[in-house]
Amino acid sequence: MRILIMGGTRFIGIYLTQQLVEQGHKVVLFNRGNRPAPVSGVEVITGDRTNPEQLKQKLQGEKFDAIFDNNGRELTDTQPLVEIFQDSVQHFVYMSSAGVYLKSDQMPHREGDAVDPKSRHKGKLDTEDYLMKQNVPFTSIRPTYIYGPQNYNDLEAWFFDRIVRNRPIPIPGNGMHITQFGHVKDLANAMCSVLNNSSAIRQTYNVSGERFVTFDGLA
């Protein structure tokens, strides 16, 4: 398959690109060109996705079997991309977030649980709603907290920094809040697994590790 990845040079995109190339797919990245491709020989189309006219100019005429939209935060990010390829792409995989769910004491969250319209990830919800209303063969991925090598967010690095400097680790609340983590390689593998899977079309999937932990347990 010829596959377009929006981004592809930071964290999740690095491992997704590597796995898709290993599986024999022809991968094309679209990004600003600020970082090298994670795999040599991968084609890179340079542009700014926040400029719809430039996006159309750069991508119109290209043919892709599948698209991974890893960095669309708002509907305005993703809609122009969908409008270009909605009549031709076989599978559009959208990176959403497990942060869209309404706070609940019933854990773990299931895909059908209530969502929070005031979530800071509202743009993700708007995009999912838009994709559902379009004639687009899409799958939405909702990952939990992702960790692993080359993480550009100071998540695990923050903890290790305090540990090596013998600094205390503050624990929110009473320490019994439940959270769940997922390794970046497992997320990339899950994203790859939806390709050529007809049952994944127009579906939403939570992706996380198998175990949960309290903040006390994490500390």
Q: Whereabouts are the PLM-identified features?
A:
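Rossmann-fold cofactor-recognition segment
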Residues: 41-51, 71-73
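NAD(P)-cofactor binding segment of oxidoreductase domains
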Residues: 62-112, 122-130
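N-terminal Rossmann NAD(P)H-binding glycine-rich loop of SDR-like oxidoreductase domains
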Residues: 3-23
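A conserved pocket-lining segment of Rossmann-fold NAD(P)-dependent short-chain dehydrogenase/reductase
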Residues: 162-182, 194, 206
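Glycine-rich "substrate-gating" loop/helix at the edge of Rossmann-like oxidoreductase active sites
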Residues: 144-153, 173-185, 209-211
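Conserved beta-loop-beta element that borders a ligand/cofactor-binding pocket
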Residues: 128-150
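N-terminal Rossmann-fold cofactor-binding loop
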Residues: 30-35, 48-49
